[in-house]
């Protein structure tokens, strides 16, 4: 069944609303892509509104980490997810989202991009 992101057919009290318009295709949504750590890099290209393309990152083990002290950006290997404020179960499942703290070859880094929407993992190295 499709995900519909329009307004509800009912009020907060439970009474039915009189809808002015019917459901439109533009109000449809998709299930979220949860980016996992894996040796195989897998991307999904999806057509969006306006015939644009969106790259969704499904699996990866690399991240672009920026070192603020040395002003250097490197592509490094991601080993695991240390903390994720989005969902506590994402830590166990190694799901990368924006704001997640990941363990890399350079050290701990905080993810600044949205991998499920951008198709790449960008992160900033945390000073310890």
UniProtKB/Swiss-Prot annotation:
GO molecular function: structural constituent of ribosome
InterPro entries, sorted: Ribosomal_eS8 (IPR001047), Ribosomal_protein_eS8_arc (IPR020919), Ribosomal_Se8/biogenesis_NSA2 (IPR022309)
An annotated GO cellular component: ribonucleoprotein complex
Alphabetical UniProt keywords: Ribonucleoprotein, Ribosomal protein
GO biological process annotation, one example: translation
Pfam families, per database record: Ribosomal_S8e
Assembly: Part of the 30S ribosomal subunit.
Record-stated family: Belongs to the eukaryotic ribosomal protein eS8 family.
Cross-referenced NCBIfam families: eS8 (TIGR00307)
Protein name per UniProt: Small ribosomal subunit protein eS8
Species this chain originates from: Methanococcus vannielii (strain ATCC 35089 / DSM 1224 / JCM 13029 / OCM 148 / SB)
Gene transcribed to yield this protein: rps8e
């Amino acid at each position: 069944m499709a995900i519909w992101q329009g307004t509800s057919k009912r009020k907060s009290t439970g009474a039915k609303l009189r809808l002015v318009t019917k459901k439109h295709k533009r109000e449809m949504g998709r299930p979220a892509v949860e980016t996992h750590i894996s040796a195989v890099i897998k991307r999904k290209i999806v057509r969006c509104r306006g015939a644009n393309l969106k790259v969704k990152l499904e699996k990866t083990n690399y991240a672009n980490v920026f070192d603020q002290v040395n002003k250097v950006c490197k592509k490094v290997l991601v080993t695991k997810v240390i903390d994720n404020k989005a969902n506590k179960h994402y830590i166990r499942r190694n799901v990368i989202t924006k704001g997640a703290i990941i363990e890399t070859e350079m050290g701990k880094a905080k993810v600044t991009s949205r991998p499920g929407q951008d198709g790449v993992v960008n992160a900033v190295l945390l000073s310890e």
